[in-house]
From Swiss-Prot:
Gene: metG
Binding site for ATP: 337
SUPFAM superfamilies: Anticodon-binding domain of a subclass of class I aminoacyl-tRNA synthetases, Methionyl-tRNA synthetase (MetRS), Zn-domain, Nucleotidylyl transferase
Organism (species): Thermoplasma acidophilum (strain ATCC 25905 / DSM 1728 / JCM 9062 / NBRC 15155 / AMRC-C165)
Organismal lineage: Archaea, Methanobacteriati, Thermoplasmatota, Thermoplasmata, Thermoplasmatales
Cellular component per GO, a single term: cytosol
Protein name: Methionine--tRNA ligase
Length: 547
């Protein structure tokens, strides 16, 4: 098997509030499963995310709480790190856009694109709140979306239909701080000339027929009406400074500089590992595929604006795939902690183990359309799949062996129909995950788990122990080999539990090395232990969430 290098960039969450399970389903769980799969296969992966700390969502929260934006960013940077860690998501580096190194990288991009003619100075109309006496950033303006008529659309984007907006596009716009209708006044800013890169972008997008249909359609629709120059600076004082004289009251806007955070993260990781040029291998070697895991609302920034910035700068790999997910809803509504819709990740982790949550969310990932989160379905899915099918299989095999003090000798089962079925399941699962079909890969695993239970039942070891020890040895060994394959396949989804079961099976190599040895007929040194699954019930789950 040829090993390859892969760069996985995961959307930078705003450091302005807790992560809810909609965030995890949108970008982070799928990315983590994909990264763990590739590492199982022996591929080298650089896994980067970070904290988006210069956005107006941070300043909005800071003003509401009477804190500085940096205080808010510090609080949620640490909280997000803990949440990801508790959920078993571990990035190689989780950068911060407030790092000085990031400002340097963003300013370098700004100057290079300016010198190449892809950034120009101009004027724009911006909302000015007379009551407060200053220009207001886009996010400080809310109103009705002119496209879908959602009443809480922001001045930069409608979260309901996903369209990017300008504040003056809104119907009945209001300043969120004063409640006043803003005036629209002229102000000087810098613009990214997306129009100059439109033909190159269209040509590049035409080669992406393997993208998810929803992502490709969204991108093609976005660009079909023609691209316009887009402002990349704002009248704010919280952000990366414009590296030119005379613009002290303006900053580079977040949607431009935050994208550069992926490169900042890769550079910082390279420095920390003692190889400062390592990042270039991931960004400049055309053989390295770059994946960007994001939510639906980030598609235009990653499929249009970021590639345009990379094209304008020159020398960088463009995104290979952008497997953006749709929305995970709660009772048909988008998750919103502030509006009391749904649950934060931390709330749920107090009520259920991380692997239970990972498994259920993976089973309902909104990969090509919205899906709905349900506590009832969480309970049913975990109990039915993880416990009744997988956990029960492991328990029955190991308890039988323990009861009769049996540890089967290795035997060649490579020609057996059941082992060939497991091999084919693994190959299809591998195709699914290499193509970022995370939910489909889980269904492959579940199918094999059902098949493995059926084989164990048909083999009837409780009978062959009495009259056919050779068949007993063969069938038990075959059940162990299929369970080994099952455990490798489920590891990217529930890593902690899978590793515990792996150790119980007594397999003579680490699960991370399994791709090299999976079809070897090695010995098992089985030792029975507590199966890492317990059934959950809805009543106790709700009680824990409410306490």
């Amino acid at each position: 098997m040829v090993q390859i290098k892969i760069l996985v960039n995961c959307a930078l969450p705003y450091a302005n509030g807790p992560l809810h399970i909609g965030h995890i389903a949108g970008a982070y769980l799928g990315a983590d499963v994909f990264v763990r799969y590739n590492r199982l296969m022996g591929n080298q992966v650089l896994y980067v995310s970070g904290s988006d700390e210069y956005g107006t969502p941070i300043t909005v929260r800071a003003e509401k709480e009477g804190r500085s934006p940096k205080e808010i960013a510090d609080i949620y940077y640490e909280e997000h790190l803990r949440t990801f860690e508790n959920l078993g998501i571990s990035f190689d580096i989780f950068m911060r856009t407030t790092w000085p190194e990031h400002s340097e990288n963003a300013q370098d991009f700004f100057i290079k694109l300016l010198n190449e003619g892809y950034i120009e100075k101009g004027t724009m109309i911006a909302p000015f709140c007379r009551k407060i006496g200053r220009f207001m950033p886009d996010r400080y303006i809310e109103g009705t979306c002119p496209y879908c008529h959602y009443p809480k659309a922001r001045g930069d984007q409608c979260d309901n239909c996903g369209r990017t907006l300008d504040p003056q596009d809104l119907i009945d716009p209001k300043c969120i701080l004063s409640g006043e209708t803003p005036e629209f006044r002229e102000t000087e800013h810098f613009f990214l000339r997306l129009d100059l890169l439109e033909d190159r972008l269209k040509s590049w997008i035409s080669s992406k027929n393997f993208w998810k249909p929803n992502v490709l359609a969204y991108t093609q629709n976005f660009i079909s009406g023609g691209l316009k120059k887009r402002p990349i600076t704002r009248d704010i004082d919280w952000g990366v400074k414009i590296p030119l004289d005379g613009y002290d009251s303006k900053r580079i806007y977040v949607w431009f500089e935050a994208l550069i955070g992926y490169i900042t993260g890769a550079k910082e990781y390279s420095k920390r590992t003692g190889n400062p040029d390592l990042w270039k291998e991931y960004y400049m070697d055309p053989e390295v595929r770059n994946y960007y895991f994001i939510g639906k609302d980030n598609i235009p920034f990653h499929a249009i604006i970021w590639p345009a910035m990379l094209m304008g700068y020159g020398g960088f790999n463009l995104p290979y795939d952008i497997p953006a997910n749709e929305y995970l809803t709660f009772k048909g509504q988008q998750f919103s902690k502030s509006r009391g819709i749904g649950y934060s990740v931390d709330d749920l982790l107090k009520a259920v183990p991380a692997d239970y949550l990972r498994y259920y969310v993976a089973s309902i990932l909104p990969e090509t359309g919205d899906s709905d989160f349900s506590l009832e379905e969480l309970v049913n899915t975990v109990n039915s799949d993880l416990i009744d099918k997988y956990g029960n299989l492991v328990y029955r095999i190991l308890s039988f062996m323990d009861r009769y003090s049996i540890n089967p000798d290795p035997v060649d089962v490579s020609g057996d129909e059941e082992f060939k079925y497991a091999q084919r399941s693994f190959e299809l699962w591998s195709e699914d995950l290499s193509g970022v079909h995370v939910k489909r890969g889980l269904l492959r695993w579940l199918d094999l788990a059902i098949y493995a239970n059926g084989f164990f039942n048909r083999s009837e070891p409780w009978k062959t122990i009495k009259n056919d020890r050779q068949k007993l040895n063969h069938d038990l060994y075959l059940s162990l080999k299929i369970t080994e394959v099952l455990t490798v396949m489920v590891y990217p989804y529930i890593p902690s539990s899978a590793e515990k079961i792996w150790n119980m099976l007594g397999i003579p190599f680490a699960i991370g090395q399994s791709y090299r040895h999976l079809y070897e007929m090695h010995a098992f040194s089985v030792h029975r232990g507590a199966i890492p699954f317990e059934k959950i019930d809805l009543e106790s789950l709700v009680s824990k969430l409410n306490n």
